[in-house]
Amino acid sequence: MRSISKEKIVGMLHFVEEQSSFIERTTKHLNSYHDFLISDSAMVLFNSTCMCLQTIGETVRQIDNLTEEALLVENYKEIPWKRIIGLRNILSHEYAAIDPEAIFNTIKIGIPPLLATINSIIADIENGKHNAQCDVSNLSSNSVLFVYVS
């Protein structure tokens, strides 16, 4: 297994946390996926939200690759990590396939548990729980298709 700096992983997790929090703050007023489509400014919010989801998916993919799936997939099974990465791929390459209703459901249903889990992972790493997945010589605490439709 590769040696990965705790600081690097925690920094990447903080980025996922920031992007997820931004999505929550900027979309809390939305009641339906139709709210993304009612005006040009609503479409700007939709596009911004999609970009945040794309960067979350890319960062999760990078963490997954760096830890050889030993951190996220093996330890935090309550989150559909592969679906998050899958959504990133759709947002990056299949623009016409982006479904506003699926994005709305993802942000309303998927982001809150993702945020809670990301905070738990950060705390676990800082408390030494994942020393096997991260380089223990770097202990500084200063130093993630994700769609819920039936």
Q: Which residues fall in each region the model found?
A:
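Solvent-exposed interaction patches of small proteins and small membrane subunits
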Residues: M1-S150
